[in-house]
Amino acid sequence: NISDEQIFSQIERMNEDFRNTNADALDATHPYFPIQADVEIEFCLSPVDENGVSMAEPGIDRVDGNRVDWSRDQIENQLKPTTIWNPNLFYNIWTVKFAASDANLLGYAQFPDQTGLQGIPANSPATTDGVVVRYQSFGSADKGNFPVMEAPFNKGRTLSHETGHWFGLRHIWGDGVCAEDFVNDTPPHR
C-alpha cells in the first residue's frame, strides 16, 4: 500500500497541473506557454464513500485483491467492476502493481462514454470508468520522500496525463505521425 502522503502529493500535483500553477506555468520557453490556461478544475478526496458513510481515510478505499500484481485483463474484468464507485458522482482512480505482461505501462484511462466527441470511441462500460496508474508513478517525489516511486516518472504527471484522456483528450499527435487529435486549436505537432 502506498502512503496517504503519497496520495495527497498526487492530488496536489493534479490541482497544480489543472489550475496552471505548476512550475512549468512560469517557463516562457515552453512552446505552449502562450496558450496555456487554468481550466478551473480542482480535485479533492471525498470525505464519504458512495453510500454517504464517513471514511477513515477520506477518498481512499484500500482493496485487498489477493494478488501480488494485476494484468490489464484482470483489472478490467475483476478489479474495476467489483470496486468502482458511481462514475456519475466520483472520479475513480486505481493504483496497482502491473503484472509482468504490462510492466512497461505507466497507466491508462478509459475515454468518456457517449460524449459525441469526434475521435472518441463510444460504448465504454460504466463498470470500468476511470484511470489506472502503476503505484510507482502515483504521487510526486517533489512533495515528499516516497521510496516506492521510480524516476523519471515520479513527478505526478502520469495521472495528469491520463486524466486528460479520461476527459476526452487524445494525444496532440493523434497517436500517429502528425495525425488528428480532433481539437481545432491544437498547434500542429512535428
Predicted regions and their residues:
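…and closely analogous acidic/polar surface helices at protein-protein or active-site interfaces
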Residues: D4-F8
